[in-house]
């Protein structure tokens, strides 16, 4: 095994270095290696497999679709499968939650969804800066990486990561940091050196930066703050969405409505690459 990977696969790899086991089979929450050993998969594809490996009810649909020669790639042309998806998503996910979003298909990955959200926010507001929180992880392409605080990831960029401000999260500075007050002071003080951002982006539950759950009260205060200063609120649901937190959208528990929502990973259902960006109609 190691000879093939060491000789032909790039050194740019991560998880396998810490756990050099060759997998061969997966079902539900169990994965099996080539020696027959079974493991509970707590990796979960980093949130891409919320419904388990090879769930029968999705697998059957996929096989039938392929056997019927369903459309696999169509750029952004109109297709019947896309029409059915949008209709189903509207009726089953958005309307029951009183969410009036337009659905944008940005590309296959979560970082694509984040990049689109940043471009939309900057275009809509005419501002450049985006505020994110310490402990954030939003992706590995340059725009998304500029929001990410992990040092090793940022250092790998090889270029300056600009137009982003990282705000101390409430758990920072020894805990109980008044983040809202701090942001307000940055905007109200003419000598702070900061200007009003186009958007503030948040994972309601940070994962890569440690399991930090932002309180309902903080999320509500953040929504009020963004509205007060005409700042767009972006919720990154890429890893915590699709029922991973108990509700389909992780922000539901706070009863807030973000301006833009980024989705990927388990929205593909089967570990397949798929992403959405949801945006309020006035931003479209």
Label every model-predicted segment.
Residues 1-284:
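Conserved N-terminal phosphate-binding loop of PLP-dependent enzymes in the Aspartate aminotransferase
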């Amino acid at each position: 095994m190691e000879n093939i990977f060491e000789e032909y696969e790039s050194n740019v790899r991560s998880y396998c270095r810490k756990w050099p086991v060759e997998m061969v089979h997966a079902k539900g929450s169990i994965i099996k290696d080539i020696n027959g050993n079974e493991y509970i998969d707590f990796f979960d594809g980093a949130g891409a497999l919320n419904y388990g490996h090879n769930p029968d009810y999705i697998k059957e649909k996929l096989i039938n679709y392929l056997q019927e020669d369903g459309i696999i790639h169509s750029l952004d042309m109109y297709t019947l499968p896309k029409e059915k998806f949008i209709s189903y998503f509207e009726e089953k996910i958005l309307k029951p939650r009183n969410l009036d979003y337009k659905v944008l298909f940005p590309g296959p990955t979560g970082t694509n969804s984040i990049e689109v959200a940043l471009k939309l926010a900057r275009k809509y507001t005419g501002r450049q800066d985006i505020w994110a929180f310490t402990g954030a992880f939003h992706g590995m392409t340059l725009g998304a990486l500029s929001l990410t605080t992990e040092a090793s990831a940022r250092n790998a960029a090889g270029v300056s990561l600009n137009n982003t401000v990282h705000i101390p999260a409430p758990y920072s500075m020894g805990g109980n940091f008044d983040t809202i007050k701090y942001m307000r002071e940055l905007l109200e003080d003419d000598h702070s050196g900061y200007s009003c951002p186009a958007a503030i982006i948040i994972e309601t539950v940070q994962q890569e930066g440690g399991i930090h759950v932002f309180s309902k009260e903080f999320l509500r205060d953040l929504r009020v703050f963004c509205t007060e200063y005409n700042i767009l609120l972006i919720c990154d649901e890429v890893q915590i969405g699709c029922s991973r937190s108990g509700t389909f959208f992780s922000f539901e528990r706070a009863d807030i409505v973000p301006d833009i929502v980024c989705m990927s990973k388990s929205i593909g259902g089967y570990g397949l690459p798929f992403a959405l960006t949801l945006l309020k109609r006035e931003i479209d």
